[in-house]
């Protein structure tokens, strides 16, 4: 038996295309190595000994993929909604993101972010961090340990930001990114 192999039983719902939903009532979805191995009205003999969690009449739906997520912004989500973008960046975002230079702050904030993400419907995500390499690497490690499938990008900023969030030059930023890529 494979290590990451289980089934969920219930009403399975997914979109066949942009206009059509498919429902399989009282059925099984077999998950193998984090992928759907199939949907079955009866559990096939080859899967008879795997763990099955009966979800009753709850809907079983695919996980969500978030293609644009700023991890450091999670700590202050919902604030400054009345501000224009540049005002929001200058008064809220830049001062908050500067805090990620402190690894102890980054660890606390990213722990909350990763834990909440893990307990959400999001199963895959493309995530922006900050320009702080150590904090970005910390976030990557935490997400890898979480079991979520993610990609994390280090932010590069050499202009139009707060002084504490700007790299010295585009060349220095590119060099820092190359070094970061070599190390990960």
At which residue positions do the language-model features occur?
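Divalent-metal (often Zn2+) His-rich catalytic cores of metallo-beta-lactamase-fold enzymes
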Residues: 129-133
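Alpha-helix C-terminal capping segments
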Residues: 116-120, 145
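N-terminal metal-binding scaffold of metallo-dependent hydrolase/deaminase domains
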Residues: 1-47
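Active-site gating loops and adjacent loop-to-helix segments of metal-dependent hydrolytic enzymes
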Residues: 77-106, 159-170
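Short acidic/polar active-site loop segments enriched in Thr and Asp
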Residues: 123-124
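Metal-coordinating catalytic core of metallo-dependent amide/deamination hydrolases
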Residues: 134-184
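Short, acidic/polar
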Residues: 102-115, 136, 170-177
């Amino acid at each position: 038996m494979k290590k990451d192999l289980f089934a969920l039983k219930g009403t399975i719902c997914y979109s066949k295309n942009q206009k059509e939903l498919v429902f399989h009532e009282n059925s099984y979805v077999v998950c193998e190595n984090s992928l759907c191995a199939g949907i079955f009205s009866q559990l096939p003999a080859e899967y008879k000994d795997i763990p099955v969690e009966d979800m009753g009449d709850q809907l079983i739906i695919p996980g969500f993929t978030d293609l644009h997520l700023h991890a450091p912004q999670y700590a202050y989500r919902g604030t400054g909604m009345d501000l224009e973008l540049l005002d929001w960046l200058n008064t809220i975002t830049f001062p908050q993101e500067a805090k990620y230079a402190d690894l102890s702050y980054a660890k606390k904030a990213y722990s909350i972010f990763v834990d909440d993400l893990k307990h959400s419907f999001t199963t895959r995500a493309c995530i922006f961090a900050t320009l702080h390499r150590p904090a970005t690497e910390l976030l990557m490690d935490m997400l890898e340990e979480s079991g979520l499938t993610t990609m994390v990008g280090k932010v590069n900023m050499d202009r139009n930001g707060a002084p504490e969030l700007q790299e010295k030059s585009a060349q220095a930023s590119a060099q820092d990114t190359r070094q970061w890529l070599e190390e990960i």
